From Swiss-Prot:
Protein name: Rab guanine nucleotide exchange factor sec2
Gene symbol of the encoding locus: sec2
Gene Ontology terms describing biological process: exocytosis; intracellular protein transport
Alphabetized SUPFAM superfamilies for the sequence: Sec2 N-terminal region
Low complexity bias: start-end ranges: 271-305, 362-376
Ranges of compositional bias, category Polar residues: 256-270, 342-361
Amino acid sequence: MPDVSNVRVKPNQHPYEKEVNGKLMSQEEILSQKLVAAIERQAALDDKYATEVHRNEALSERIRELEAKLSAKKSFDEELVKFHNLEEKLQLTETKCRNAESEKSRVENELEDLTSSLFEEANRMVANARKETVASEKRVNQLKKQLVDAETLLSSTQHQLTELKDVMHSMSDSHEQNNALHPPLSRTTSFVADNVSVGSFASSTSGLDILTGTSARESLDAKEISSDKHLNISGERPATFPNPTFIEGSDERRSASSLGHRTNNNQNQLIRFSTQIRSSSTSPPRSPLIISDSPSSSIIHNPHPTHPSASAMNYMNPCFLEFHAFFNYPMKFARSRSAYSTSANYSNTPPRNTVTPSTARSSTLSQNPSSSSNSIPLISRNLRDFSFFKRCLEEDIEPTLRLDHASGLSWLTRRSVFTAILESSLIINPLHSTSLLSSQPCSLCGFNRTQPLRQFEFRSRPDSTSHASCTYCVARLRSVCNFVAFLHQICKGVWSSCSLEKAWDECLKKREAMFLSRVGLAKELEG
């Protein structure tokens, strides 16, 4: 745009031109002012633009800084979240480690306890095995001795059988010679001769059974049952004839007399025996006569002077028949023992006028007194050998004890307690209320109330562990122990002087006491 400040107006211009020039000058001034204003405005705008640009750059820089801070904050937050997660995981891991350590210590303690208990049980089992081994060795030695004694007794019985055959031959010869003098006794003589051979052989066989211990209980039960089959309706036994060996002379007279003298004596004794047969057939005894099939069959026993009533004893009851055989076993043992000693004395004194190989062997055996003294049979003390005890064990003892359900006893402890009960060696003592054992649960039924506390403790041996027991379980234990003690008394012959009816009534009372203690009605539980 041209600069108009240096333009000069010519003096000799036309007025119209002057007017036009004045207007142009005014317009020029106006335009100049506008131009100046526009320039100033542009400069201001440039300044403002520069300022805004600078401000924009500052804002952009600030935005970049804030964005950087924001991204850094986001990454920090993420790292912080990760840190919190890791911290929680660390706490969980520490908790698991503590739990694992406590569990490890508990398992180690249990392992130590189990190891100690295992060693104790192993030592106890080894000790029991050693005891059983020693007992089995003793039993084997006893069986060997009994076998030797059985062989000795067998040779003795064979010698007796040979002598009895000689006596039978001599009696038959004398019978043929004196048949005309004694015609009524011919039939009786043959009957007696048959009974002599058969009865002596049966008695010898039963003595061997008792000595060797083979099937003793079965043979006794079978003999009792077979004898009970001959009972009549009223319960009385038929008249039983005595064994012919009962009428023989004493050992002194037999050793001092010859064969002919013994034949005459036997003939006189046959007359007396026939008289006894006639008297027994006409007037049978009121009480049953028991003729034992043991070697002591020469003695007539009448153990029960009064016949028991049918309400107390029932011969059709298998349980009573088993108890009858169990009750008679000690008496049979005593009779067989005395009869065996008598037969041994008889076998040691052979006739003087006869010498045979069997008598020579008998004289050789008689010179050894230890063999005759050691060959006396021993009575069985084991209750398990009797069928009556097996019945009571199944029907009364096991339901009363219920040791299989005893939660506080281990298997070995149950076995030792049951063995102690059968051996009558169980120990039951009262407990004081301040004892630590009284606050423990009952070992048999698990009774664990605080009121009342356990008042008793029991153990199988004096040096064994004590077990707490409540009053109910003690009543059961005592009832079973009383019954087992009663059976041991019968085995030892304490009840031999009493009648069968009295022993049977006492047995029923003991079994009833076990039932009452089992249902909780024992006398110890009253009140």
